[in-house]
Amino acid sequence: MKIAIAGYGVEGVANYQYWNKPGNDLTIVDQTHPSQKPPDGVPLIIGEDAFHNLNGFDLVIRTAGLSPYKITTNGKVWSGTNEFFSRCPAPIIGVTGSKGKGTTSSLITEILKAAGKTVWLVGNVGVPALDLLEKIQPEDYVVYELSSFQLWDIERSPHIAVVLFIEQEHLDVHTSMEDYVDAKAHITRFQKSDDILVYNGENQYSKQIADESFAEKIAFPTAQTAHVVEDAFYYGEQLICSTNELQLVGTHNQDNACAAIDAVWLTTQDTEVIRTGLHAFTGLPHRLKFVREVSDVRYFDDSIATTPTSAIAALRGFEEPKVIILGGSSKGSDFSTLAEEMNQHEVHALLIGEEAHKLAQSFDVSGFTDYEIIDQPTMNTIVQRAHEIAQPGSVVLLSPSAASFGLFKNYADRGDQFIAAVNEL
């Protein structure tokens, strides 16, 4: 079988290794020379139009970040996610949303581990799913963090689907907001009445997806399911534990915990198990993580916050005065809601990157004036300016509400540079 491995990053390598079997004739295809070194002797097709000229291949395996719209072939377009779903022997809990996927997936994993289950965490937050497929047993559980890119053309849905808060994002890749939401909806599109959909009942797009689902539907947070009352988690009227057991900042993370509790409730209703699982997870890198305290000012790395809503969640996580670093490259976001939120806080904003002037325009419209634009910044100059402004007892947040490209390689590089700059103060 002639197979094209379309895209050769981390996932592309996993795809190559999985399909590198006797009888398969593999070719690696990418727009630029791959960052991962291809195996010797394997044919390469490199070029801007490489994905548009794949006729003659029986199978084209696209990496998640490659839009199926960019592939032209008379063969079948497939993905590692599709392959995993078609062959995984264990029940899959799939998690999607604009933000919180990795955190919620990790919380579900920790609760199931506390219940004594063997759990495999895969997707962006874990390892490439195909790398683990041979190890998974029918009695295990798989928790799969699923982006819109992975869900784009999926042909099966997980047994338990979790849809978190959805907002405008990735419009630099998706053709429209409708296309983005439609891709997310694949997580439940193939579910049946004996499957389960856990969804954010306070978000219009999550509810829109639920309206189309045939699965049993569980909204969160509600008085009948997982919710928070007076600093404690409840399921219905049953007390689970104090919210202090959750080692994560912000009410948005309490919502993520509620989604995780709902997702595992049919597997375990042991409140001590759930408490243990919630407490075990200390957070993922670059997700509102404490870095250091300098001169009575606390610094937090929230570089993963690439949308306005995630920056709003970071602002609401602290009552103290704040300095927030905002901006980066464009994802087509609307900053008007963030601009209105800024007026509710004692906060000074440092604006950087391509989106700095768009943010400033939104702030001007809302009447928020406590901001400055830093031209041609480095992370050291950004952090140094924050250090100069921040008063004792305040908080400095890197919560950019925009992508990182242009100034940094990716959100992780941005966060790592922030941590390094803070540690140099």
Language model regions located:
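Short, basic phosphate-binding NTP loop
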Residues: 1-94, 108, 115, 279, ...
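Active-site beta-alpha connecting loops in nucleotide-dependent enzymes
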Residues: 3-15, 27-34, 284, 303-375, ...
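Short beta-strand "acidic-cap" motif of Rossmann-like dinucleotide-binding folds
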Residues: 26-30, 120-121, 143, 219, ...
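Short active-site oxyanion
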Residues: 25-26, 56-59, 118-119, 139, ...
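Residue-level signal for inorganic ion chemistry
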Residues: 19, 60, 95, 124, ...
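Active-site regions of enzymes building and remodeling cell-envelope glycoconjugates
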Residues: 39-48, 57, 74-79, 90-93, ...
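Phosphate-binding loop of NTP-binding sites
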Residues: 51-59, 64, 68-201, 205-215, ...
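Nucleotide phosphate-binding/pyrophosphate-handling subdomain across enzymes
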Residues: 18, 118, 246-347
